């Protein structure tokens, strides 16, 4: 990577109001691609946020006017504000995006990220990833046949449908600003984000490909050649099989030591239980490493199911999700949150950000309360 080339978001100033996972993930994505991200912590901000790579922090009490003025001064120069709060919180704090923030800085992009829709029946309710997936229709697609729907950790709603989709909205607003010169309010929620990600399977439920109940379709665990299988290893290890196409399926069958002519036709779903039983018995005959050796370098679409601890011990390199040839993001270096789980201490690096962003100096423009670490404005000239 050429260090002389700028990162794609270099020069963009992002203010992230501290919150739970989706908002910090949104901020981390922007920081990884060069944005200067300042997290605003409060007296009761969440502790132990591991999604803090490449960020700085200051402490502000948004309910205390002299402290809130620090935030307003920062936002007068910022490009983006990430708001992770429930609907109406900013307004109650006197920080309405349309009536206050955009009037003070017309170029500001205010990204508001909620779990439920802001205009839906659940808008004022608490919730988590499982709830957002539930009302989006996505959760009902996940799980084994005859069993309860099963939540996929909090990856799909919080991070893919929430934080990542919010980044898309922010980038679109920044592109729009290049043409109009104006910022705007961006609204993202995990219900719509998750539902949008599920567009293909949702539409496919109207076709024979995905027309059966949950857990009885090709891609949802019902199909024996798109599933996981336990190996001979003590304690349980697994292989993942994704041999969808017929020519890949033939390679799978040969690798398992089976004769295709002895197997029932896979196109008939009535044969799926028998095929699954045959595959289960075969995979149980060898260890995961032995099966990996059999299928490595083939087009059987068979791979080992690796666990996080194994990847860490093997030195697996965490990389950014998208590589830009001319304007790359920041590489994730060892110790920068790849496997360490390090957190960002409240107030760390924030004073340097204030100096660079708005020219503020401690003791001249603000002071820091001794016990709480809260910043309070002490000069009105620059407010």
From Swiss-Prot:
Highest taxon, organism lineage: Eukaryota
GO molecular function: isopenicillin-N epimerase activity
Pfam family, one: CoA_transf_3
Annotated pathway: Antibiotic biosynthesis; cephalosporin C biosynthesis
Catalytic activity: isopenicillin N = penicillin N
One GO term (biological process): penicillin biosynthetic process
EC assignment: 5.1.1.17, 5.1.99.-
Active site, UniProt feature: 158
Enzyme's top EC category: isomerase
Keyword annotations of the record: Antibiotic biosynthesis, Isomerase
InterPro entries membership: CoA-transferase_III, CoA-Trfase_fam_III, CoA-Trfase_III_dom3_sf, CoA-Trfase_III_dom_1_sf
Similarity comment text for this entry: Belongs to the CoA-transferase III family.
Biological function: Together with cefD1, catalyzes the reversible isomerization between isopenicillin N and penicillin N. This two-component IPN epimerase system may function by two sequential steps, an activation of isopenicillin N by the acyl-CoA synthase component cefD1, followed by epimerization by the acyl-CoA racemase component cefD2.
Full protein name: Isopenicillin N epimerase component 2
Gene it is expressed from: cefD2
């Amino acid at each position: 990577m050429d260090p002389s080339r700028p990162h794609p978001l270099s020069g963009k100033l992002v203010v992230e109001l501290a919150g739970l996972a989706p908002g910090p993930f949104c901020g981390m994505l922007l920081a990884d691609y060069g944005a200067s991200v300042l997290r605003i912590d409060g007296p009761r901000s969440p502790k132990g946020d591991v999604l803090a790579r490449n960020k700085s922090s200051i402490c502000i009490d948004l309910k205390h006017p002299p402290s809130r003025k620090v935030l307003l001064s920062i936002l007068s120069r910022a490009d983006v504000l990430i708001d992770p709060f429930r609907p109406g919180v900013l307004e109650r704090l006197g920080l309405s995006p349309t009536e206050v923030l955009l009037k003070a800085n017309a170029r500001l992009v205010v990204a508001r990220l909620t779990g439920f829709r802001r205009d839906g029946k659940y808008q004022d309710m608490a919730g988590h990833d499982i709830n957002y997936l539930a009302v989006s229709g996505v959760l009902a697609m996940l799980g084994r046949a005859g069993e309860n729907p099963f939540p996929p950790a909090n990856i799909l709603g919080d991070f893919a449908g929430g934080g990542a989709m919010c980044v898309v909205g922010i980038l679109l607003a920044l592109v729009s600003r290049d043409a109009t010169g104006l910022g705007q309010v961006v609204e993202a929620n995990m219900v719509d984000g998750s539902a949008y990600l599920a567009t293909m399977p949702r539409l496919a439920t109207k076709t024979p490909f995905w027309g059966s109940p949950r857990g009885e379709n090709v891609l949802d665990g019902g199909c024996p050649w798109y599933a996981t299988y336990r190996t001979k290893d003590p304690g349980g290890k697994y292989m993942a099989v994704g041999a969808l196409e017929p020519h890949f399926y033939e390679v799978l069958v040969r690798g398992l030591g089976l004769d295709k002519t002895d197997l029932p036709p896979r196109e008939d779903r009535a044969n799926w239980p028998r095929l699954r039983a045959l595959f289960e018995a075969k995979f149980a005959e060898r260890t995961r490493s032995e099966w990996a050796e059999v299928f490595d370098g083939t087009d059987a679409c068979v791979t080992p199911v690796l666990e996080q601890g194994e990847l860490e011990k093997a030195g697996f390199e965490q990389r950014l999700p998208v590589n830009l040839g001319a304007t790359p993001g920041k590489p994730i270096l060892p110790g920068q949150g790849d496997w360490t789980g390090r957190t960002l201490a409240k107030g760390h690096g924030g004073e340097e950000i204030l100096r660079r962003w708005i020219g503020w100096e401690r003791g001249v423009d603000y002071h820091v309360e001794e016990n709480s670490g809260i910043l309070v404005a002490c000069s009105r000239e620059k407010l």
